[in-house]
Amino acid sequence: NKKTKKKISAVVVVHVLGNSANLLELKKICKKNKIYLIEDAAESLGTFFRHKRMRKHTGTIGDIGCFSFNSNKIITTGGGGMLVTDNKKFAEKARFLKFQAKKNTYYFEHTEVGYNFRLPNPNCGIGFPVINIEIKIAGTI
């Protein structure tokens, strides 16, 4: 950033109302500048980004994809969400923080501030069948 002289770590792109952003251009800029691309796909679950022969779901093109299952979203569980990534380091860090940053020991040791981001089982029971229906519908389009 020229004004603050700080390095930009990530760009967050928001796909709104089922419309995909121009991901090819953003991904190219991010890759060139070694910046992570994070997709907020809360309002675009089931949307495809298409370019020539490429057809990929929004939320799966950047380094991290974020989805929401709040009551006003495409699939609802009454709350919660989903994070997707193919970066092993990011996935491990997300799992660690999700379980209150507790180390895998027999005693309780927290090495940093963690969160309780686990969705209760009844909420999963509400959302899971809907996800299966969405997958079947998406496969026919």
Q: Which residues make up each language-model segment?
A:
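Alpha-helix C-terminal capping/helix-to-coil transition sites in glycosyltransferase folds
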Residues: 7, 60-61
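Active-site region of PLP-dependent enzymes
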Residues: 43-54, 61-141
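Catalytic PLP-binding core of fold-type I/II PLP enzymes
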Residues: 2-12, 17-53, 87-89
